[in-house]
Amino acid sequence: MSQSYINVVGAGLAGSEAAYQIAKRGIPVKLYEMRGVKRTPQHKTSNFAELVCSNSFRGDSLTNAVGLLKEEMRRLDSIIMRTGEAHRVPAGGAMAVDRSGYAQAVTAELENNPLIQVIRNEVTEIPDDAITVIATGPLTSDSLAKKIYKLNGGEGFYFYDAAAPIVDQSSIDMDKVYLKSRYDKGEAAYLNCPMTKEEFIRFYEALINAEEAPFNSFEREKYFEGCMPIEVMAKRGIKTLLYGPMKPVGLEYPQDYKGPRDGDYKAPYAVVQLRQDNAAGSLYNIVGFQTHLKWSEQKRVFSMIPGLEQAHFVRYGVMHRNSYIDSPNLLAPTFATCKNPNLFFAGQMTGVEGYVESAASGLVAGINAVRRFKDEEAVIFPQTTAIGALPYYITHTKSKHFQPMNINFGIIKDLGGPRIRDKKKRYEKIAERSLKDLQQFLTV
């Protein structure tokens, strides 16, 4: 086995982060990426760290678990966080990016790093020539997936991810929508499409009766709750959308609103939000409207949304299969495999769910691949931190109940002592302790 470089397979969020962390520590990297020579069903470009589902890195507040994780990653010099900050677009209290400019910048930085050799080629075998980080993501090619499944005891776990449609801003009827962020948090960053009760019921009936695209015969429906198709969510009951992506709370009508409304109510019955998708503000995605409907049905049903009657859809919603391994049986909290300490996994295939979580796993895997390379003790971050709690959770939960997991305060080690009833204050205390413990851990 070579002791002159480390392999990273896959240049998505996790692989890009891992490659950067390895090179930053002075170790040469061979970074393999098949896009450029082989397409995937979901990606549109050959850029590294391409965002395929949404352009949002979610909430920024430290009272939000993903906000805490992002802050920890910033303190660990994450290329994904740093580049994301440089390509932010307005999104209220969330962090959203111009997905094209952001991905191009990550690609350029890694391609121009003298310690990183980019190899545009499909990897069909698990490399054994050097320490290796596999970060091929939910769209792992079939040939490599078969080899990974052998490690997985011949089992293949998966669920379905769906992406929301994107519309051309110039085709939105701006007289029917208004600009506002929920509860007026941050700047007014979302275009809101308000619905009366009658409009919502008409839309709901069309949605639950719309025709879905077919699954392959060997596939069955299995969804991750955080990226569930809007039509599947709707079929759980008419109120589901009103407490989910179409909830009107905190999105009251502006004073100059002249459109239809239910009596004297200050807020709509339901709201569809549109979020800016690029820096120029020429594209908007329909927030929370991941879908598996046929494209013709998407056009028909989503054109019922006020303001989108004449909308030009530059991308329809699509769905892909998202594979993940049995991390509780296969991985250590370092992201190395238990049976082969020279083989690491990172990203969504480990069972972490979300852009930020994927990048965080790549950061930890990259650091530990270097530690292995130098024959040093692996780093396991404290369970009191978000970046330590996530790998601990995916490697210690009961295998038969294992499902992909977003970061949340429920998996971070409890504060202990009397429980603080006020949720915001409790989360503030957890975040304060996390950042303090991380700083202490890094100085040691």
UniProtKB/Swiss-Prot annotation:
Q: Where in the cell is it found?
A: Cytoplasm
* SUPFAM superfamilies linked to this entry: FAD/NAD(P)-binding domain
Enumerate the cofactors the protein uses.
FAD
Binding annotation for FAD:
G10, A11, G12, L13, A14, G15
Q: Which organism is it from?
A: Streptococcus mutans serotype c (strain ATCC 700610 / UA159)
Q: Which domain of life is it from?
A: Bacteria
Q: Its GO biological process terms?
A: tRNA methylation; tRNA wobble uridine modification
Keyword Cell membrane among record annotations = no
**Protein name (Swiss-Prot/TrEMBL):** Methylenetetrahydrofolate--tRNA-(uracil-5-)-methyltransferase TrmFO
Gene this chain is encoded by: trmFO
